[in-house]
Amino acid sequence: RRSMTDSSGHLVEHFFRHESAHLIAVLTRAFGIRRIDLIEDMVQVAMLEAMNAWKQGGVPDNPSAWIHRAAKNRILDALRREKTLAQAISLAGPTLDVQENIVEEWLSEEQLPDSLLRMMFVCCHPTLNRETQIALTLKTLCGFGHAEIAGGLLLPIETIRKRITRAKRSLGEANVAVELPCPDEI
């Protein structure tokens, strides 16, 4: 374990943005686009837990694995707590145990690029307009905040927030699969 110092703040921020994109891509693929808000929330919780734990106990030898496991466990815990667990399981897949195994496989180094590419196609779904595609991609895959996106696109923060919220709702209602499109669709 390595100690976490104030000077490593920029590295930690970069690491978290990078890992956040991987996690959101993999977990959305596993649990479905309808769960993207829960997934983003639980990834943030895992990141906060990491910051707190690492300040006290140092950075683990494999910080990526630590965050991946924490985020996955938070989502599984949240799904177990849902009032309509049967509905959650039917939306998420066959069983939570099967989902857990799938997530482990998809978090492997070989699978991460595919998951990110799949998520990029979801963020750029043809039902979304170009500006919304850009905002959703910057938020979901690049880890930018609403204010950063708004500043870059020269739009009010609230406009960006609403676009991203509507895009997630639209993709969820359409139950867009987190898969690669057919070659003739590209």
Listing of model-derived features with the role each one plays in the protein:
Residues 127-144:
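Short amphipathic alpha helix immediately N-terminal
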Residues 41-48, 61-73, 162:
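Structural recognition of an alpha-helix C-terminal capping motif at a helix-to-coil junction
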Residues 5-14, 24-43, 53-61, 157-158, ...:
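Short, charged helix-capping/linker segments at alpha-helix termini
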Residues 23, 27, 67, 71-79:
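Hydrophobic-face residues of short alpha-helical interaction/recognition segments
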Residues 4, 142-159:
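Helix-turn-helix DNA-binding module
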Residues 153-174:
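DNA-recognition helix of helix-turn-helix
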